[in-house]
Regions:
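Gly/Gly-Pro- and Ser/Thr-rich, intrinsically disordered tail segments characteristic of DNA damage-repair
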Residues: 1-239, 383-420
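Acidic, metal-coordinating catalytic segment for phosphate/diphosphate chemistry
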Residues: 20, 323-420
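DNA-contacting surface of Y-family translesion DNA polymerases
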Residues: 2-3, 10, 194, 204-353, ...
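Short loop/turn motifs enriched for small/polar and acidic residues
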Residues: 122, 157-159, 308, 359-366
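Short, charged/polar surface micro-motifs in flexible loops or helix N-caps
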Residues: 14-16, 46-49, 310-313, 366-369
């Protein structure tokens, strides 16, 4: 089946965290050195030198500093590396400003993470008008640089996959095209690990059978790929290596609305039995929602916690994460935070003497996982708090197990159990 020609842009911020930290520093002290011009990096604890690198400057890259490596190792490579802490509020501010600019060019805008988005500009620029696409890409880059102070790369193609690959070519502040006829020259020579959607384990399996470049995968027998990787993954790698993708740019308003689960209780829950009766239920509902998301191949960004009172009034709280998720642990942690606000806060329902009979957990602002990558923002937060979360998880799991045993003992075996 032929692919439909579209005019697709992928806009990606160059060294997003580092650039945005540099801009804030210059705003606060115009006489300071621009972090982007010296060996510098974002991540970890600046005082203790613990943690990992979440972003680096181009000068730091020349010393071999890599995103994701321990701060200690980065300092061994570059002893004079300037470290700055993460500043998530600043990152949110610049991300929102960027998306506001991009939304002026087309309503067909799909934000993929805090620092990147796809735009379908077919209604504005015909697919055959490739010169016009280059002009518009330059306009977007200039507008972002002049109005916001940082640079972006723009990848242009007829589908999302190739536009994404193009934006990862030479940086910073560049426009690159990767049309289907350019794939053999521009994409096939690249290492197989550079193929978007090909993870480390998949790439390693392919190397073991002599597939080292994207071109090798493109020309490999489909049966071989499916034997090594499985039917679905093998077909995906085969299509991607040949530049084939039919994933559409999906604005929020066109995405599925939500995935949620709720449960009505046979008893009222108030402050006295919240710990023993509500927490295991929130755990179970979060796992069920995560399971449904994973089965549907979806991830969401907004988590909602809702309850119904004994008088049948509904109350809810929701928050939008900085990343897309389908993970039960993240959904549960967010739901527990919202539950605490709604029920136990100074103006919470329990403080007002309102008990509850129904609990629900939901995730909305959904997108297909096929073209969704882990948000850099969330990845940074996760790495910075990784050890703390691991320790807390053990204690929480033990507590939850005890709670589930207790509630099952009170209301009968199987009342609450771990979601499948």
């Amino acid at each position: 089946m032929e692919q439909e020609d579209r005019t697709i842009f992928h806009v990606d911020v160059n060294s997003a965290f580092l650039s945005w930290s540099a801009l804030k520093r210059l705003e606060e002290d115009p006489g300071s050195v621009d972090l982007r011009t010296i060996p510098s990096a974002v991540g970890g604890d600046v005082k203790t030198r613990h943690g990992v690198i979440t972003a680096k400057s181009i000068p730091a890259k020349k010393y071999g500093v890599q995103t994701g490596e321990p701060v200690v190792k980065a300092l061994q490579k570059c002893p004079h590396l300037v470290l700055v802490p993460s500043d998530f509020e600043t990152y949110r501010k610049y991300s929102h400003a960027l998306m506001d600019i991009l939304a002026k060019y087309t309503p067909l805008l799909q934000q993929m993470s805090i620092d990147e988005a796809f735009l379908d500009l077919t209604d504005r620029i015909r697919p055959e008008d490739r010169e016009g696409a280059l002009v518009l890409a330059r306009q977007i880059r200039d507008t972002v640089r002049e109005q916001l102070g940082f640079t972006v790369n723009v990848g242009i193609s007829s589908n999302k996959l190739l536009a994404k690959m193009a934006s990862d070519f030479q940086k910073p502040d560049r426009t690159h095209t990767l049309y289907p006829e350019e794939v053999p020259a521009k994409m096939w020579p690249l290492p197989i690990g550079d193929l978007y959607g090909c993870g480390k384990q998949t790439a390693q399996k392919l190397r073991l059978v002599g597939i080292n470049t994207i071109g090798d995968a493109a020309s490999a027998d489909l049966v071989l790929l499916q034997t090594v990787l499985g039917e679905r993954t093998g077909l995906h790698i085969h299509n991607s290596a040949n530049g084939i993708s039919r994933s559409k740019v999906t604005p929020e308003r066109e995405q599925a609305k939500s995935v949620s689960n709720e449960r009505t209780l046979s008893i009222d829950i108030d402050r006295d039995n919240y710990q023993t009766d509500a927490l295991p239920l929130i755990h179970m509902l979060s796992e069920k929602v995560a399971g449904r998301l994973q089965k549907a191949g979806l991830a969401g960004q907004t988590v909602t916690f809702q309850v119904k009172s004994a008088d049948f009034d509904r109350y809810s709280r929701q928050t939008t994460l900085s990343n897309m998720t389908d993970r039960a642990e993240e959904i549960e942690a967010t739901a527990l935070y919202l539950a605490d606000q709604l029920l136990n806060g100074p103006d919470g329902l329990f403080e007002k003497g309102i008990s509850i009979r129904l609990i629900g957990v939901g995730v909305s602002r959904l997108t297909e996982k096929q073209m969704q990558q882990m948000d850099l923002f969330a990845w940074a937060e996760q790495n910075e708090q990784e050890e703390k979360k691991r320790q807390a998880a053990k204690a929480r799991q033990a507590k939850l197990n005890a709670m589930m045993d207790q509630i099952n003992g009170r209301f009968g075996g199987g009342t609450v159990k771990k979601g499948e």
